[in-house]
Amino acid sequence: MSLHFIPLHRRLNFGFVISITLLCILATMTLHAQVPIARLPKPPTPPEQAQWKEHGRTLPTPEARQPVLDAALPAYEPRRDIELSGHFKGAASDVLAILTHQWIAAFQKYYPKVTLDVQPPYAGSLGALELIKGDLQFVMVSRELKPTDVSGFAAKFGYAPFSAPISGGTFRHFGFLDAMGFVVHPDNPLKQLTFDQVDAIYSSTHHRGGKAITTWGQLGLTGEWADKPIHVWGVKPWNGFEEFIRQRALSVGDKRGEWRTDINFTETVFPISPAVAADRYALGYAGLAYIGDNVKLLDIAADASGPAVPLNYDEVIHARYPLCRLVFFNTNKKPGQPLDPVLAEFLKFILSREGQQVILDEAIFIPLRSEQANASRALLAP
C-alpha cells in the first residue's frame, strides 16, 4: 500500500477540511454514546483498600473530553467585614481525599488564619455518625447518608444532619461515583423506564401510586414478551448503589421506599451486569463502570410526562440524566440558626465558580450546574 501526502504548499480543499472535522466530532460523540465497557472491573484487594484508607484512591485517567464550567455560576466574594479564623477538623471519603485538600488549599488563600484539617483514615463508609461524636465539624461524603446515619444523629440532636450537594459524580470512573443505569438483555425490545415503573417493579411500598409490575407485557411489550416474567436483580441493602436508586425512584417526600423481598439480591454490584447478560428476561441496575457491553442500557425518565434521557456523556455533564450521582458536604447545623461563619464560607466557596473550577482542574468529578449550586447555597439560610 502506498501513502500519498499533500504538500504543505498546496491549498487544501475547504470541503475536505470540513469533512475531516465533522468526522472527528462524530467519532468523539460515538465514543461517549457507546458507554458500556467490554472489560468489567474487579473488586479491590485488601492491600488496595489499605492504601486508599491512608492516602485516598489513586485518580483514574480523566475522560478525553471535559465539561465546560457553567457560565452562570457566581464568582466567589470573600468576606471583608470580619476576619475569619479558627481550626476545624473534618473527614473525607477515599475518593474525595485529593479533591478535598485541593478545595482547602484554594480556600485558605483567602483566609490564611483558617485551618481546615482533614487527615486519614479516608473511607467510603464515612457519614453523619462521625459528626455525632463531636470531634469532627464536617464530613465530605461520596454517597447519600444511611438511614442509621440520619436516625442516630437525630436521636442525639433532635434534628437531621445538614447535607448539601457540592459536586457532581463522575461519568464512568470505577469506584468514583459513576452514573447509574438500568440494563436488560440485548434481545429485549424495551427502550426506556420511568421512575414510576421502577417503583412498581422493585418496591413493595409503591409510594408513586402504581400497581405492581411483574411481566414485560405490563411495560408495553407484546408478542412472545407479553406474558414473560421480569427477573429482577438488585444489590442487597445496605449499599450505596441500592440506597441511591431507593431514594431517587422508590421514595417520595418523607416516605421511604422498601424493596420487594423476592428480588435477586447480590452482595455487591459486580455480578449484576453479567447476570442480566445471561438471562433474556432479566432487569438490573448498576453503576456505568460495572456495566458490560453485552447488555442494553435503558433511557430513563424521572416522570411519565418528561423525556426519557439516555445515559451518555452530554446528558450526565449537564445533569439532565436522572441517575447522575452527587457529592455531599455534611455538618451539624441547627434549624433556624446560621452555620458557623467559617464553614458557611467554605461551602459558599465550593459552590462558587472558583470552587467548581477546582473540580474541573482535577478532571475526574463533574462540576455542578448553576441551578444545582444555587439549590445547595439556599440550604444555608437559617
Model-found features: residue ranges?
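Short linear sequence elements within intrinsically disordered, low-complexity coil regions
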Residues: R10, S19-T21, P112, S370
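A general, composition-driven signal for non-globular sequence regions
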Residues: H4-F5, L26-T28, A97
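N-terminal secretory signal peptides that target proteins for export/translocation
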Residues: M1-L12
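Exposed boundary/loop context
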Residues: L8, L26, A277-R280
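Sec/Tat signal peptide C-region and signal peptidase I cleavage site
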Residues: M29-A33
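Flexible loop/hinge segments at secondary-structure junctions
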Residues: Q34-P382
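Bacterial N-terminal signal peptides
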Residues: G15-T28
